[in-house]
């Protein structure tokens, strides 16, 4: 059969640079950002005594042996743990998701099924479901609300995932070869993005 979809959600123009920005935003917010070097005088070992007197030696004046100019000295403006996250506007995020959905639909990577209910939360049941539908390993199941049995059955499959429509994002849509959802999920996507 076929399902009617809103053209405003599933027939967007693909803006590659916007999609790239969205993916960069997602990956940047995942970064640990924990690069750090010794920063302050308090972080360093070594004497705080003045190596020689200020005047009269003919050498350059120096205050301590941990000056940044000296070997073994502290790092000036070195990296500190920080967040690399940045934001896109709501409109940009929406347009990027619409673009990827349209691209997936055009590439016939969308499968709509009546139900995604599994009786037992077992991996072999998820494999049987995927094999029965001829789905590739990289499959994303989009569900309108939490489906515990499906989530538990799929979580041990390395490349398949279950995602709530509320968590719909460009990265997950791009990473998976096939998107599987129900008419209820499509309705919820349309409500969210129209």
Enumerate the language-model features and the residues they cover.
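Glycine/serine-rich anion-binding loops at beta->alpha junctions
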Residues: 39-77
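A short, flexible low-complexity segment enriched in Lys/Arg and Gly/Pro that occurs
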Residues: 17-55
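Extended polybasic, low-complexity segments that bind anionic RNA or targeting/receptor surfaces
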Residues: 1-33, 78-194
């Amino acid at each position: 059969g076929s399902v009617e979809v809103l053209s405003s959600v599933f027939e967007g123009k693909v803006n590659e640079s916007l999609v790239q920005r969205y993916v960069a935003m997602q990956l940047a917010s995942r970064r640990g950002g924990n690069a750090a070097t010794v920063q302050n005088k308090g972080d360093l070992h070594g004497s705080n005594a003045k190596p020689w007197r200020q005047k009269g030696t003919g050498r350059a004046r120096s205050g301590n042996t941990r000056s940044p100019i000296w070997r073994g000295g502290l790092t000036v403006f070195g990296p500190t743990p920080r967040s690399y996250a940045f934001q896109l506007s709501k409109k940009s995020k929406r347009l990027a998701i619409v673009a990827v959905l349209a691209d997936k639909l055009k590439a016939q990577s969308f499968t709509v099924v009546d139900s995604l209910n599994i009786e037992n939360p077992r991996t072999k049941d998820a494999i049987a479901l995927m094999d029965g539908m001829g789905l590739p390993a990289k499959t994303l199941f989009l569900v309108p609300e939490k489906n515990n049995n499906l989530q538990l059955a799929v979580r041990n499959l390395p490349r398949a995932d279950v995602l709530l429509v509320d968590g719909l994002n460009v990265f997950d849509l791009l990473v998976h070869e096939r998107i599987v959802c129900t008419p209820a999920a499509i309705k919820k996507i349309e409500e969210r993005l129209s």
